[in-house]
């Protein structure tokens, strides 16, 4: 048997639940043959696929090494832990969960420090006054260095944080922090605020592909099938299917509907009997149905879509372009 296609997903908590739900919505059911405590699984109905349950940081490391083909992990971990990430991995698709911003946060008492330029001035003055560099507590060492360098901030020292980073200024181990936040409530509770231009990265969970993985014809085909499921589900989420039939339905009316409502005609124009199927953005449904009824339609039905499968697969095309580059 050939080497399996390996998909790495988070091993616990909300990230695992969200990842499994994401794949399930795309028609890809992840199953653990050994029960909930098993760290290996499969995708039901797909042969020679191994699902590896790992921590988010382990997933990033395995993607860098090429020991997994696809992994679900946060962009923040990819950017922090993989040098030249854009050359070694591809962010195939943002999954819409695990959202968090990597930010620069300073004490609320620093009323004159609103931007990174202000911080540059303060760090220079701090060193002159205290004969030491200002301390920045963070787990994101590489992201911090890159972001600070891009803003010309050099008079600082990183204090690597192993725990609750937001508490570092209060206990005196750092003057400011770089950390992740979702709502900012924890920062505010610790007397901190984000600089106006201090959002370093808006992160979310991504489906990530590794360049170093063993990309055979078989594993590429497995990737195509997985990405076809995901793209089909995503495409379906953008539209509702609208059906109607009336004698006044013609190509000119269809062209007007396209222009006004952004509809797609997946099966072409109206049939000889006036039967028409359209895919319509949800926000345009009422306007479209009123338009069709105003031109003679007696009945307009609306159907939710589970999958819309096109010949073109933009996600697989993105993967192929990355592997060729």
UniProtKB/Swiss-Prot annotation:
Encoding gene (name): hisG
Activity: how regulated: Feedback inhibited by histidine.
Record's keyword terms, sorted: Amino-acid biosynthesis, ATP-binding, Cytoplasm, Glycosyltransferase, Histidine biosynthesis, Magnesium, Metal-binding, Nucleotide-binding, Transferase
Protein name per UniProt: ATP phosphoribosyltransferase
Domain of life of the source: Bacteria
Gene3D superfamilies registered for this protein in UniProt: Periplasmic binding protein-like II (3.40.190.10)
Any one Gene Ontology molecular-function term assigned to this protein's record: magnesium ion binding
CDD domains, per database record: PBP2_HisGL3
Cellular component terms per the entry's GO annotation: cytoplasm
Location(s), subcellular: Cytoplasm
Catalytic activity: 1-(5-phospho-beta-D-ribosyl)-ATP + diphosphate = 5-phospho-alpha-D-ribose 1-diphosphate + ATP
Taxonomic source organism: Rhodopseudomonas palustris (strain BisA53)
Biological function: Catalyzes the condensation of ATP and 5-phosphoribose 1-diphosphate to form N'-(5'-phosphoribosyl)-ATP (PR-ATP). Has a crucial role in the pathway because the rate of histidine biosynthesis seems to be controlled primarily by regulation of HisG enzymatic activity.
């Amino acid at each position: 048997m050939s080497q399996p296609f390996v998909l790495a997903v988070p091993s616990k908590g909300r990230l695992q639940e969200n990842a499994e739900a994401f794949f399930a919505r795309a028609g890809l059911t992840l199953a653990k043959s050994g029960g909930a405590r098993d760290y290996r699984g499969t995708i039901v109905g797909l042969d020679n696929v191994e699902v590896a349950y790992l921590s988010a940081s382990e997933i990033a490391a395995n993607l860098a090494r090429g020991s997994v083909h696809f992994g679900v992990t946060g962009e923040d971990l990819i950017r922090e832990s993989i040098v030249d990430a854009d050359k070694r991995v591809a962010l195939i698709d943002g999954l819409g969960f695990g959202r968090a911003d990597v930010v620069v946060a300073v004490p609320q008492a620093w009323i004159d420090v609103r931007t990174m330029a202000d911080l540059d001035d303060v760090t220079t003055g701090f060193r002159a006054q205290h004969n030491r560099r200002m301390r920045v507590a963070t787990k994101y060492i590489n992201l911090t260095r890159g972001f600070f360098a891009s803003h010309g901030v050099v008079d600082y020292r990183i204090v690597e944080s192993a725990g609750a980073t937001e508490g570092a200024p209060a206990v005196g181990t750092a003057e400011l922090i770089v950390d992740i936040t979702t709502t900012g409530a924890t920062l505010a509770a610790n007397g901190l605020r984000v600089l106006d231009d201090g959002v370093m990265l808006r992160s979310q969970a991504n489906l990530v592909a590794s360049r170093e993985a063993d990309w055979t014809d078989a594993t590429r085909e497995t990737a195509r099938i997985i990405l076809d499921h995901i793209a089909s589900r995503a495409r379906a989420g953008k539209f509702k299917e609208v059906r109607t039939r009336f004698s006044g339905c013609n190509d000119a009316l269809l062209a007007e509907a396209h222009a006004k409502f952004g509809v797609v005609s997946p099966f072409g124009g109206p049939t000889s009997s006036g039967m028409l199927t359209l895919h319509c953005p949800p926000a345009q449904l009422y306007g479209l149905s009123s338009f069709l009824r105003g031109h003679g339609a007696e009945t307009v039905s609306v159907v939710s879509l589970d999958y819309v499968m096109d010949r073109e697969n933009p996600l697989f095309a993105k993967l192929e372009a990355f592997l060729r580059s």
